[in-house]
Amino acid sequence: MANSRILNDTAIDGQIEETTAWKDFLSLIKIGIVNSNLITTFTGMWLALHISGLSFLGNLNTVLLTLIGSSLIIAGSCAVNNYYDRDIDHLMERTKVRPTVTGKIQPNQALWSGILLIALGLIMLLMTTVMAAVIGFIGVFTYVVLYTMWTKRRYTINTVVGSVSGAVPPLIGWTAVEGHIGVVAWVLFMILFIWQIPHFLALAIKKTEDYRAANIPMLPVVHGFEVTKRQIIVWVACLLPLPFFLGSLGLPIVILGTLLNVGWLVLGLMGFRMKNIMKWATLMFVYSLNYMTIYFVAMVVFTLF
C-alpha cells in the first residue's frame, strides 16, 4: 500500500478525502469497535482484581497481555469481517469507503492480516489463562463464522447472534485474572449482550435503506419499524433486573444502573408518540452509547474508593 492515496469515489462537502495507509489500516480493523470493547474488557479485569483483593500494579503484566491480546483478536475479527463483506459493503453509504471496497487494501492483505492478528491475540491471552484464550476464541468464532458468514445475510436474528461476540470482552478480562467466570462477570456479559440488541436495532432503523440495498435482513427491513420498536422496548426492559445482581459492587452501581435503564425505557416508550422515527432512533442510539460508557467506567471509578 502507498503511504498516501486519494479516494476518488467519495467526497465530503465537495472535498476529495485523502487517507493514509495507517488510516486505511485503522478503518480495516474498525478501531472504534476495538476501543469501545477495551473499555468493557478492562472493566471485567478491574472488577476481578477488586473482588479478589489483588493489586492492579502487582498484576500489570496480566493487564497488558489481556488488553493487547483482546485488542488484537477484535481487530483481526473486524479485518476478516471487512474481507468477507467487501461484496456488499459497496452497496451501503456508511461502508462503501472501507479500504477493502475502494481497493486500498487488497482482499488477501485484509484476510491474512486478520488471521495473523487473531493468532497473536490468542497467544497473548493464553499467556494469562487458558480460559481467557478459550473465551477469546469463542468470541472470534461467533463473530466471524456464526454472525458474519452464517446469520448476517440470512436471518433477522443476526443481531442477537452478533451480540454474543460483543458481550465476551468482560469475560476475557475477568478470566485473565481469575481463571474462571464469576457471578459478576456473567452479569456484565448479560448487560452487554442485551444492551447491544436495542443499540443495533436503533442503528438498523437509521440505516434501513442501506441494509435493504445490500439485501441484509435486518429486523426493520423485514418486519418494519413498529415491530422493531416493540422489540427494542422488550430488550431494554430485560435490562431492568440486572443491576440488582451487582450489589457486591456497592449501592451506587445498583442505583446508577437502574436510573440508566429506566431512562432508556422511558425514551424507548416515547417512540410510540414521536412522529419522526428517525429522530427517535438517533436519540436511542446516542443514549445507548452513553449508557455503556457511563456504566462501565462508573464501575471502575466507584470501586476505586
Curated annotation (Swiss-Prot):
Chain segments annotated as transmembrane: 38-58, 60-80, 115-135, 157-177, 181-201, 236-256, 285-305
Pfam families xrefs: UbiA
Anything else known: Carbon 2 of the heme B porphyrin ring is defined according to the Fischer nomenclature.
Annotated membrane topology: Multi-pass membrane protein
Signal sequence residues: none
Main function: Converts heme B (protoheme IX) to heme O by substitution of the vinyl group on carbon 2 of heme B porphyrin ring with a hydroxyethyl farnesyl side group.
GO cellular component, one term: plasma membrane
InterPro entries per the UniProt record, alphabetical: Protohaem_IX_farnesylTrfase (IPR006369), UbiA_prenyltransferase (IPR000537), UbiA_prenylTrfase_CS (IPR030470), UbiA_sf (IPR044878)
Similarity comment text for this entry: Belongs to the UbiA prenyltransferase family. Protoheme IX farnesyltransferase subfamily.
NCBIfam families: cyoE_ctaB
Keyword annotations: Cell membrane, Heme biosynthesis, Membrane, Transferase, Transmembrane, Transmembrane helix
GO molecular function: protoheme IX farnesyltransferase activity
The reaction(s) this protein catalyses: heme b + (2E,6E)-farnesyl diphosphate + H2O = Fe(II)-heme o + diphosphate
Source organism per UniProt: Bacillus velezensis (strain DSM 23117 / BGSC 10A6 / LMG 26770 / FZB42)
Coiled coil: none
Protein name: Protoheme IX farnesyltransferase 2
Gene Ontology BP term (one): heme O biosynthetic process
Subunit architecture: Interacts with CtaA.
Chief location category: membrane
Listed EC numbers: 2.5.1.141
Subcellular location(s) per record: Cell membrane
Pathway(s) served: Porphyrin-containing compound metabolism; heme O biosynthesis; heme O from protoheme: step 1/1
